[in-house]
């Protein structure tokens, strides 16, 4: 059973954005990079401005293309339905469980996922969080201290679609 925060929930279709340097006509999970927050998958954001920031970073990193925000609709009732065909994990906020999950995924440089979720929703490990993650991995702080320090940092939320089944529920607009 999945519980979704009212803050993230809308009635009907949820609009999600993916920042890139190209128009994405067909999502190809094989192009996913290893060592990401929730694993290899397709990452989306409910905030169009944040997706544009990612598009700008991607264009600069790839040194080609122009910043483009691809938009998708997703039926968010699939996140809370008891009979959903999808395996969904939602992290409401920074937590010990979230931090351990991020660490496992970031350390995984194989093509085999460390979890079996179709969709994962939760805070982005942005620059501030990334700094804390590096401090943790270098042994300067422990995981409990990291989570405590992040408690005062307002999280930006990301949506991870990690399987073809999950991708099939995204409708490009």
Predicted regions and their residues:
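Conserved NAD+-utilizing ADP-ribose enzyme module
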Residues: 2-14, 36-37, 57-173
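Short aromatic-glycine-(Arg/Gly/Cys) micro-motifs in beta-strand/loop hairpins
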Residues: 12-35
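Short, conserved beta-strand segments within well-ordered enzyme catalytic domains
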Residues: 18, 43-45, 71-73
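Short, flexible loop/turn elements at secondary-structure junctions
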Residues: 21, 48, 76-78
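N-proximal short alpha-helices
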Residues: 24, 45, 102-106
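Extended catalytic/binding region for NAD+/ADP-ribose chemistry, centered on the ART fold
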Residues: 33-57
């Amino acid at each position: 059973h999945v519980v979704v925060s009212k803050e993230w929930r809308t009635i009907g279709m949820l609009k999600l954005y993916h920042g890139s340097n190209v128009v994405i006509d067909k999502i190809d999970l094989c192009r996913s990079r290893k060592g990401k927050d929730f694993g290899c998958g397709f990452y989306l954001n409910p905030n169009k401005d944040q997706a544009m920031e990612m598009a700008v970073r991607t264009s600069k990193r790839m040194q080609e293309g122009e910043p483009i925000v691809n938009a998708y609709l997703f039926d968010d009732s699939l996140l809370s339905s008891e009979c959903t065909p999808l395996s969904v994990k939602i992290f409401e906020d920074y937590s010990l469980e979230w931090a351990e999950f991020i660490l496992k995924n970031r350390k995984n440089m194989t093509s085999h996922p460390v979890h079996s979720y179709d969709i994962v929703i939760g805070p982005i490990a942005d620059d501030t969080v990334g700094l804390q993650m590096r401090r943790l991995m270098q042994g300067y702080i422990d995981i409990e201290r990291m989570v405590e320090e992040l408690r005062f940092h307002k999280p930006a939320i990301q949506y991870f679609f990690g399987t073809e089944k999950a991708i099939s529920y995204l409708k490009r607009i």
